């Protein structure tokens, strides 16, 4: 058992005070112990071959407009991976969010994010602290996202500043009474050092085909708007407030396992909430390969879904495009109604991974059909001839 879980095993508090429907989130004092809640929902970590410090999905914003049109808002959110979750959280505005990942390091990664949200006064300061680049001045200005990127890019990493911030981050993490070990704090520092070393050039893997963190921050939705959580002060402040009130809960677990995802569902149910969105990336591809998709699907069907609940997926076709694919993007973002997923599973399930990601995938562009023309969108502003995209 991991040290984090060993230290808390005798102090788990499973009870959560329920809240009324759409009412405002309760004050922090009414929340269970943050560490205890994280532990109670978690299970033993598993293996994944990469660190996933930032996303590799340039298409991650392409579902935002469709979700807004469908009324996907409020309730509870569940996602996997690093900070692309914050963009979905900023758009959906849930009352609570759970980040589940098979990797224990992802929990520690989110403790780094959480502490940085607590320390930072502005978006610029948030990026400065993570990258070890003191570009924020007195912390009182509020530049646009392009200027934030430019300031970080033109400010060299500063060892003294980084060391001071790394120490402060560790102190903040320990102030939550998290029983993290010295070894786990070293993992937090290792992740922090990767942000310092590469700055905005940090990638999912340091090879050219993956986007940099800079590119991910500056990406746009299908309407041409920059909608990353760092793009506007309003988006950043919502996520920051949720983090400061311990409403972004990192969970260690296999989504096909017997405990973590089901426990999250029960925690949502106890609170009187409904699950509005599950961001699963391309995890289901690995589940189908490993023969564990059916246990996962069974758990999904039992979750307390909202009426307009959705499943957000990422598809990596290695050259094969889908109707929702956008020219210039290595990934394709997909959206399925939870009701469609449940109905299909009850009708016999999906025949393959490609069947899963295509059968009930919604068109994402308003006013565009489900045929190949739905995918003819330009990554940035402007247009691209159909012949350049169509297979």
Residue ranges and their predicted role:
Residues 26-69, 76:
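Mature N-terminal segment immediately following signal peptide/propeptide cleavage
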Residues 71-85, 97-98:
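Conserved class I S-adenosyl-L-methionine
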């Amino acid at each position: 058992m991991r040290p984090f879980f060993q230290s808390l095993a005798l102090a788990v508090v499973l009870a959560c005070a329920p809240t009324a429907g759409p009412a405002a989130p309760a004050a922090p004092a009414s929340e269970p112990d943050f560490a205890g809640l994280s532990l109670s929902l978690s299970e033993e970590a598993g293996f994944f071959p990469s660190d996933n410090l930032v996303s590799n999905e340039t298409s991650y914003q392409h579902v935002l407009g469709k979700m807004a049109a469908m009324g996907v808002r409020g309730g509870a959110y569940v996602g996997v991976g690093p900070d692309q979750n914050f963009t979905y959280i900023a758009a959906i505005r849930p009352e609570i969010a759970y980040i589940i990942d098979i990797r224990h390091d992802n929990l520690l990664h989110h403790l780094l994010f959480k502490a940085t949200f607590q320390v930072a006064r502005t978006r610029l300061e948030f990026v400065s602290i993570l990258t070890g680049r003191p570009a924020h001045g007195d912390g009182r200005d509020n530049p646009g996202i392009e200027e934030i990127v430019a300031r970080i890019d033109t400010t060299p990493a500063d060892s003294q500043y980084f060391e001071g911030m790394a120490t402060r981050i560790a102190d903040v993490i320990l102030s939550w009474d998290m029983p993290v070990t010295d070894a786990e704090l070293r993992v937090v520092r290792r992740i922090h050092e990767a942000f310092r070393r590469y700055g905005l050039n940090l990638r999912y893997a340091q090879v050219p085909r993956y986007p940099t963190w800079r590119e991910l921050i500056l990406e746009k939705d299908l309407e041409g708007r920059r909608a990353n959580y760092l793009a506007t002060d309003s988006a950043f402040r919502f996520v920051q407030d949720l983090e400061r009130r311990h409403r972004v809960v990192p969970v260690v677990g296999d989504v096909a396992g017997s405990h973590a995802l089901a426990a999250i569902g029960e925690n949502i149910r106890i609170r009187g909430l409904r699950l509005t969105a599950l961001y699963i990336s391309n995890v289901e591809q690995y589940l189908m390969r490993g023969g564990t998709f059916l246990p996962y699907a069974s758990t999904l069907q039992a979750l307390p879904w909202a009426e307009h609940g959705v499943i957000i997926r990422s598809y990596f076709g290695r050259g094969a495009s889908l109707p929702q694919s956008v020219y210039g993007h290595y990934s394709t973002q997909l959206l399925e109604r939870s009701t469609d997923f449940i109905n299909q599973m009850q009708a016999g399930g999906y025949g393959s991974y490609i069947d899963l990601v295509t059968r009930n995938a919604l068109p994402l562009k308003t006013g565009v059909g489900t045929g190949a023309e739905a995918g003819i969108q330009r990554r940035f502003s402007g247009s691209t001839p159909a012949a350049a995209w169509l297979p």
